[in-house]
Amino acid sequence: MMPTDVRAIDLMIGFPSAESRQKYDYLRKNLRDAESAEMEMPAEYMFKDIPDHKEPEDDAVAITLAAMDQCGVEIGLVGVQSDAAKRALRAHPDRFAASLEIDPNKITATVRQIREAHEEWDLKAVTTFPSGCNPPVPVSDRRYYPIYQTCIDLDLPIVANAGIAGPRLPSDVQDVMHFDQVCYDFPELRIVMRHGAEPWEALAVKLMLKWPGLHYMTSAFAPKYYPQAIVDYANTRGADKILYAGYFPMGLSLERIFTELPNVPFRDHVWPKFLRENALRVFKL
């Protein structure tokens, strides 16, 4: 049974925006179908009831904080690129932690960007979307390797999309098998797969069994759609490897997530680790 006294840590949360379409402009130049060009969020065809975006006069930080308080979320990991995130990190350092989204194609500039953001914002993670890079880059590519060493030097995990991309972009760069080489080459690196790893979720489990540093977070999936292989793994040998992450406000409301979560058949010992303890350890929160 899901406990009611564990304050969750959400490893993928953001802030509603009246101009949410603009934050996906970097992807649109690579999208080719007409329908995607009209979408506000390039993967919106996958989601029902996407949370309403705020009016220009609304306080985005207050909206997210209220949703967190309502659902028992103590800390949210947010990308430092938005103005709302910067305001939240300054005003509420006890409620928000910083991550940085990167594209490894400009290697030296990206390494410098990570180090500068870490110094300014006390980064807790570096994140990346291989299919969304321009051009796309598999996680096993040499362009990522200086990024990984920088993460090791700064004691940061790397979080990377795995599985078929939601936006209509080629997904071969997100084949889960790419992580096998990275784990071999960087045994000190903490790696977290995000966004499902489907249809290779069984392979993701095999690789997590093999590699101590490889983990999985449940971002962008409503709890009723968590892959069965992931739930089974958490309940057996993977209780320390599976971490909670939501997708508010990009595709899911916290209300929906926390309404569905109690129906996930995790064993009792898994819940505190899934909701909180694994995040504290892997992200050094």
Tell what function each PLM region has.
Residues 107-112, 224-229, 253:
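Short, charged, surface-exposed secondary-structure boundary motifs
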Residues 74-75, 81-166, 170-173:
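Active-site gating/metal-coordination segments in enzymes
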Residues 1-11, 18-70, 238-243, 251-285:
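Mid-to-C-terminal alpha-helical segments outside catalytic/metal-binding sites
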Residues 68, 89-93, 118, 183, ...:
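N-terminal cationic-hydrophobic initiation segments that often serve targeting/anchoring roles
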Residues 124-125, 133, 137-243:
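Catalytic pocket-lining loop regions of alpha/beta-barrel enzymes
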Residues 8, 76, 96-98, 158, ...:
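Hydrophobic/aromatic residues located in beta-strands of well-ordered beta-sheets
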Residues 15-16, 164, 198, 250:
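Short active-site segment of divalent metal-dependent hydrolases/proteases
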